[in-house]
C-alpha cells in the first residue's frame, strides 16, 4: 500500500513539473584569474570567473520545476565539480548540473532543478560563481571554426540567456603575443574525454606553397596519438589568437602511428596556410614532442626548421586523471538543444567512463494549412544520420462576404473573425448607388458608342448612347388640300426615318377621258372649233367616236372647209359637216415626257363632235410632209396629226381659229415654230359640200396611251406595242382608184394623206400607229382580222353600186374589202395598265365637251342656241 502511494506521488510530481525561465536575472561580474603560466589574458586562458544573480519565487516556481542557463562560446567549466547548488542562508533551493560544450557544442550550459525546500511562501535570491574558459577556436571541427568568430581582441560583450531572459556584461580580452607569421602550436585539454587536442599551423608563405611537410614525434612522456581523429586542411586566415577561421581541403599524404604523425603537401595557393589537428592521450605532466617544419614558398627554396616543445598543463580543480579510458558517444534526441552527460560509473567495477552527447536530430519543418481553428504539430522521426520532419498544420479561415449599402460616401470593409468556427465574415458597406440618366443621341460616325459618366456618391450618373443616323425614306403623296406639308417620322435607333411630303393634287394631273352624248338633230351647216390649253399630263388620251347613220346621201365638202393641224404640242382644228347620220368625235391629249410631264408646260386638248354622211375621219402619224417613217416606241420629231371631218354649218362660237393670236385670249402653242399642213381632197373625188343635215347617234371608243417621245411633237405613241411597225401610216398622193371596192387607206408608202369619200356609204376609218404591216384590213372582225389593227373600215349603208359612190385610193392595187352589214366595228387593242384600251357604249342624250384636265364642261348657253337653230333647219 505504501509503495502504491509513493508511486502515485511520484507520478503527480512528474506530471506537475514545468519549465520556468528568468531565474538567472543578472550578470554581476566576469574576472580573469591566471591558472597557468600564460603570458596574456586571452579568452581561452583559464580561469574566467562569472558571477551571476538568481532568484526563486515560490508563488511561480514549484519543486521539480527546471530552468537552464545557456552560455554561448564557453568551452568548459574549470572545476572538478559536476554541479553547483543555489543556496541562501545555507538552504539549498536548486541544484545545477555542469554541461561543458568543449569541442562538441558551441556553448556550455547549466541545468537546474528546484528543490523541495521552496514553498509558495518563500522567495529566495542570491549569486553563483562559475569558473569557465571561452572557446575561440583551435581545431578544424565545425564547432571550433564557428567559435573562432565569437570574439576579437579588445572589448567584447558576453551574453548568457535563461530562456527569454538575457544577461550580459562587457569584458576586455587581450590578443596573443605570438608571431602570426611563424609556425603556431596549441594544445588544449578536454576533461570530459581526458584527451589533449594538438593543433599545428605551418609558417606563412604570402605567395603560396610549392611543397612542405609537418608533423611531430613523441620524445618523452606517456603520449599516444589517436590516428582516427586527424584533420588536415588549409585556412584562409587566423583570428586574433592564431586559430584557423576556415578549413578547405587540399591534396596531402598522411603517415600516422601512435608515436608520430607526418603530413606532406604541395601547391597551396596564395593566401592560404596548411594546418592539421589530432587527439592525443596524455598522462603525467612531462611531455616532450619534436616537430617537423619543412616548407618551400613559391619562388623560394625549401626551408627545414624543426623544433622541440614541452607541453605543460594547468591546475584543474579536479582532473579526474585516474588513467581510465574515457569514451564519448553521441545520441540523437528530440530536444531542441544539445547536452553532454556522464553515464553512471563505478571505478571498482566499470573500466570505461562514458560521456554521452545528447544531440538533437536535424529536422526540417513543413508548414501546411487547413480550414480550421487550432494549430497542430506532428513529427516524423528518422534514424541517426538522417533528417526528421516536423509538420506544422496552421489553420486558416474561409470568409463569406456580406455587402450592404449605407449613406456614407466611401466603401468600408470589416472582417469579423470567428473564434470558434473556420468561417469569418467580411462586411462590405458601399455607398448607395447614384440614379442614372440615359441619353440617346445621334452623331456623324457610322458606329454606336456608350459613355458612362460616374458622379460622386450622392450625384447622378449619366449614360450617353451615341447612335449613327438612321436612313431616311422620302415619300411624296397627293392630297386634296391646297397647301403642301412635310411630316418627318423619326424611328428609334436602327430603324428608318420617314419623310412624307403631301402636295396639292390638281385635277389637271388626271387623264381626260369620257364619252359624248348622242342627239338626233336636223341638217345644218356650221363649224365648231374648241381649243384649250392645259398643263401637260404624263399620258395620252385619244377618243374616237363613230356611229352608223340612219340614212345617207352624198355631200360635198368644199376644199376651203378642210381641217388643218399644226406640228406643235396643241391640236387646233375641228370641222363639222352635214347630210348624214354618222357622228365622229375625237379627243386627243398629248404629253411630251422627255423632261417629265410638268404642269408648267401647257398642252392641248380637243373635243370634236361631227355630223357627216359620207366623210372619212383619219388620224395619221407622220412627219410634216407625210413621207417619214415612224419607229416602234418613238415619235417623229416633226410629226403632226391631221384630222379631216365634214361638219354642218353651225353658228360660229367665235372660237379663234388661230390659237395664240394676239387678243384671242388663247395661249400660244409650246413649239417655237408652227408648220400647217392642209389636207386636200383625193383627186377624182367630188367636193364635199359644207352644209348638210344629220341625226347624231353616239357610240364611243376610248384609247389611252403613255407617251415616251423624244421631241416636242405632241404626237401620241403607239397605244399597243404589239401593233408596232416601222412603216409610216400614210397614203400615196398618186394612188389608183378602185371603183368596185370600198375605199381604205394604204399605209405602205409615204406621202400626204387625203380624205377619201365613197359614193354612198358612211365610213369611219382610224389608222392606229405602229402596226405590223402596211396592209389594209377588212372592217369585218374575223379571226386574225383587226387584232393587228392597221385600218378598220365600216360600211354602214348602201354598196359600191349606189349613185354617187367615188372610187377610193389604193396604192398597192389590191382590193381593200367591204362589209355589207349595218354594224359598226370598234377597234380596241388591250394593253398594259400604262397602255390601257377601253371600249364603252354610251347613249346618254347629253351634249358635252371636255377641257384639258378631263372635266366635262356643260355648254348650256350655246347648246340652247344650237338646238334652236337645228329646229329651224329641221
From Swiss-Prot:
It is a lipid-anchor; GPI-anchor. Changing residue 663 to S: In allele ALS2-2. GO terms for cellular component: cell surface; extracellular vesicle; hyphal cell wall; plasma membrane; side of membrane; yeast-form cell wall. Residues 548-577, 618-630, 723-746, 783-814 have a biased composition (Low complexity). Changing residue 729 to S: In allele ALS2-2. It is found in: Cell membrane; Secreted, Cell wall. The keyword Glycoprotein applies. Glycans are attached at residues 253, 315, 541, 625, 788, 810. N-glycosylated and O-glycosylated. The GPI-anchor is attached to the protein in the endoplasmic reticulum and serves to target the protein to the cell surface. There, the glucosamine-inositol phospholipid moiety is cleaved off and the GPI-modified mannoprotein is covalently attached via its lipidless GPI glycan remnant to the 1,6-beta-glucan of the outer cell wall layer. Residues 635-656, 673-715, 755-764 have a biased composition (Polar residues). Its main location: membrane. Changing residue 830 to P: In allele ALS2-2. Keywords: Cell adhesion, Cell membrane, Cell wall, Disulfide bond, Glycoprotein, GPI-anchor, Lipoprotein, Membrane, Repeat, Secreted, Signal, Virulence. ALS repeats lie at residues 364-395, 400-431, 437-468, 473-501. Residues 852-874 form a propeptide. A lipid is attached at residue 851 (GPI-anchor amidated aspartate). Changing residue 533 to T: In allele ALS2-2. Residues 545-579, 618-819 are annotated as: Disordered. InterPro entries: Adhesion_dom_sf, Agglutinin-like_ALS_rpt, Agglutinin-like_N, Agglutinin-like_N_N2, ALS, Fibrogen-bd_dom1. Disulfide bonds join 73-150, 96-112, 205-297, 227-256. SMART domains: Candida_ALS_N (SM01056). GO terms for biological process: cell adhesion involved in multi-species biofilm formation; cell adhesion involved in single-species biofilm formation; cell-cell adhesion; hyphal growth; single-species biofilm formation on inanimate substrate. Cell surface adhesion protein which mediates both yeast-to-host tissue adherence and yeast aggregation. Plays an important role in the pathogenesis of C.albicans infections. Each ALS protein has a similar three-domain structure, including a N-ter domain of 433-436 amino acids that is 55-90 percent identical across the family and which mediates adherence to various materials; a central domain of variable numbers of tandemly repeated copies of a 36 amino acid motif; and a C-ter; domain that is relatively variable in length and sequence across the family. This is Agglutinin-like protein 2. It comes from Candida albicans.
Amino acid at each position: 500500500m505504501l509503495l502504491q502511494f509513493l508511486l502515485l506521488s511520484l507520478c503527480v510530481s512528474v506530471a506537475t513539473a514545468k519549465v520556468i525561465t528568468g531565474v538567472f536575472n543578472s550578470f554581476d561580474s566576469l574576472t580573469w584569474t591566471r591558472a597557468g603560466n600564460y603570458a596574456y589574458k586571452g579568452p581561452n586562458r583559464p580561469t574566467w570567473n562569472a558571477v551571476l544573480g538568481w532568484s526563486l519565487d515560490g508563488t511561480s516556481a514549484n519543486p521539480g520545476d527546471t530552468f537552464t542557463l545557456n552560455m554561448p562560446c564557453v568551452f568548459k567549466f574549470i572545476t572538478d565539480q559536476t554541479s553547483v547548488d543555489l543556496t541562501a542562508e545555507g538552504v539549498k533551493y536548486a541544484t545545477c548540473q555542469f554541461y561543458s560544450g568543449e569541442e562538441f557544442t558551441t556553448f556550455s550550459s547549466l541545468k537546474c532543478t528546484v528543490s523541495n525546500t521552496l514553498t509558495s511562501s518563500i522567495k529566495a535570491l542570491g549569486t553563483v560563481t562559475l569558473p569557465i574558459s571561452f572557446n575561440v577556436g583551435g581545431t578544424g571541427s565545425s564547432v571550433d571554426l564557428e567559435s573562432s568568430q565569437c570574439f576579437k581582441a579588445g572589448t567584447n560583450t558576453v551574453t548568457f540567456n535563461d530562456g527569454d531572459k538575457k544577461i550580459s556584461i562587457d569584458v576586455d580580452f587581450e590578443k596573443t603575443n605570438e608571431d602570426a607569421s611563424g609556425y603556431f602550436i596549441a594544445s588544449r585539454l578536454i576533461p570530459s574525454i581526458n584527451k589533449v587536442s594538438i593543433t599545428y599551423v605551418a609558417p606563412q608563405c604570402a605567395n603560396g606553397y610549392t611543397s612542405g611537410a609537418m608533423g611531430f614525434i613523441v620524445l618523452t612522456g606517456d603520449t599516444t596519438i589517436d590516428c582516427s581523429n586527424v584533420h588536415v586542411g588549409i585556412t584562409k586566415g587566423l583570428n586574433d589568437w592564431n586559430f584557423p577561421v576556415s578549413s578547405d581541403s587540399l591534396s596531402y599524404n598522411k603517415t600516422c602511428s601512435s608515436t608520430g604523425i607526418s603530413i606532406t603537401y604541395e601547391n597551396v595557393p596564395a593566401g592560404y596556410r596548411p594546418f592539421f589537428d589530432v587527439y592525443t592521450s596524455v598522462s603525467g605532466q612531462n611531455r616532450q614532442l619534436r616537430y617537423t617544419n619543412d616548407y618551400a614558398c613559391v619562388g623560394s627554396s625549401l626551408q627545414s626548421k624543426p623544433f622541440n616543445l614541452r607541453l605543460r598543463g594547468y591546475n584543474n580543480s579536479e582532473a579526474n586523471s585516474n588513467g581510465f579510458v574515457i569514451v564519448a558517444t553521441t545520441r540523437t534526441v528530440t530536444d531542441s538543444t544539445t547536452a553532454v552527460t556522464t553515464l553512471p560509473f563505478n571505478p571498482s567495477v566499470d573500466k570505461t567512463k562514458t560521456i554521452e552527447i545528447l544531440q538533437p536530430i536535424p529536422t526540417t519543418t513543413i508548414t501546411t494549412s487547413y480550414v480550421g481553428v487550432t494549430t497542430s504539430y506532428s513529427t516524423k522521426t528518422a534514424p541517426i544520420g538522417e533528417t526528421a520532419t516536423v509538420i506544422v498544420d496552421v489553420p486558416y479561415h474561409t470568409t463569406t462576404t456580406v455587402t450592404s449599402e449605407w449613406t456614407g460616401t466611401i466603401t468600408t470593409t470589416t472582417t469579423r473573425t470567428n473564434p470558434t468556427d473556420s468561417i469569418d465574415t467580411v462586411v462590405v458597406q458601399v455607398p448607395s448607388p447614384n440614379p442614372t440618366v440615359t441619353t440617346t443621341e445621334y452623331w456623324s460616325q457610322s458606329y454606336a458608342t456608350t459613355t458612362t459618366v460616374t458622379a460622386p456618391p450622392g450625384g447622378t450618373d449619366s449614360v450617353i448612347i451615341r447612335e449613327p443616323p438612321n436612313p431616311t425614306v422620302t415619300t411624296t403623296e397627293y392630297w386634296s388640300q391646297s397647301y403642301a406639308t412635310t411630316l418627318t417620322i423619326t424611328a428609334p435607333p436602327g430603324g428608318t426615318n420617314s419623310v412624307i411630303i403631301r402636295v396639292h393634287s390638281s385635277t389637271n394631273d388626271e387623264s381626260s377621258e369620257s364619252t359624248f352624248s348622242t342627239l338626233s338633230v336636223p341638217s345644218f351647216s356650221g363649224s365648231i372649233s374648241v381649243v384649250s390649253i392645259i398643263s401637260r399630263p404624263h399620258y395620252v388620251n385619244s377618243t374616237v367616236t363613230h356611229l352608223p347613220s340612219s340614212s345617207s346621201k352624198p355631200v360635198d365638202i368644199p376644199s376651203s372647209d378642210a381641217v388643218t393641224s399644226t406640228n406643235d404640242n396643241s391640236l387646233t382644228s375641228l370641222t363639222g359637216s352635214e347630210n348624214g347620220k354618222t357622228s365622229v368625235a375625237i379627243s386627243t391629249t398629248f404629253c411630251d415626257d422627255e423632261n417629265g410631264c410638268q404642269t408648267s408646260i401647257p398642252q392641248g386638248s380637243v373635243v370634236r363632235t361631227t355630223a357627216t354622211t359620207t366623210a372619212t375621219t383619219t388620224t395619221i402619224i407622220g412627219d410634216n410632209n407625210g413621207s417619214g417613217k415612224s419607229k416602234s416606241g418613238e415619235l417623229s420629231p416633226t410629226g403632226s396629226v391631221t384630222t379631216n371631218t365634214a361638219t354642218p354649218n353651225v353658228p360660229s362660237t367665235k372660237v379663234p381659229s388661230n390659237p395664240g393670236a394676239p387678243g384671242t385670249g388663247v395661249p400660244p402653242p409650246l413649239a417655237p415654230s408652227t408648220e400647217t399642213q392642209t389636207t386636200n381632197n383625193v383627186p377624182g373625188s367630188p367636193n364635199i359640200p359644207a352644209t348638210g343635215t344629220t341625226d347624231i347617234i353616239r357610240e364611243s371608243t376610248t384609247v389611252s396611251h403613255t407617251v415616251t417621245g423624244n421631241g416636242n411633237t405632241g404626237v401620241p405613241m403607239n397605244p399597243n406595242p404589239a401593233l408596232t411597225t416601222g412603216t409610216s401610216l400614210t397614203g400615196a398622193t398618186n394612188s389608183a382608184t378602185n371603183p368596185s371596192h370600198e375605199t381604205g387607206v394604204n399605209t405602205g408608202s409615204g406621202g400626204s394623206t387625203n380624205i377619201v369619200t365613197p359614193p354612198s356609204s358612211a365610213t369611219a376609218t382610224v389608222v392606229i400607229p405602229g402596226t405590223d404591216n402596211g396592209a389594209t384590213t377588212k372592217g369585218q372582225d374575223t379571226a386574225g382580222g383587226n387584232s393587228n389593227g392597221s385600218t378598220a373600215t365600216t360600211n354602214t349603208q348602201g354598196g359600191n353600186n349606189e349613185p354617187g359612190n367615188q372610187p377610193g385610193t389604193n396604192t398597192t392595187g389590191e382590193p381593200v374589202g367591204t362589209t355589207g352589214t349595218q354594224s359598226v366595228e370598234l377597234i380596241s387593242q388591250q394593253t398594259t395598265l400604262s397602255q390601257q384600251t377601253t371600249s364603252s357604249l354610251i347613249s346618254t342624250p347629253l351634249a358635252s365637251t371636255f377641257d384639258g384636265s378631263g372635266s366635262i364642261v356643260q355648254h348650256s348657253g350655246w347648246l340652247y342656241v344650237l338646238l334652236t337653230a337645228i329646229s329651224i333647219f329641221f
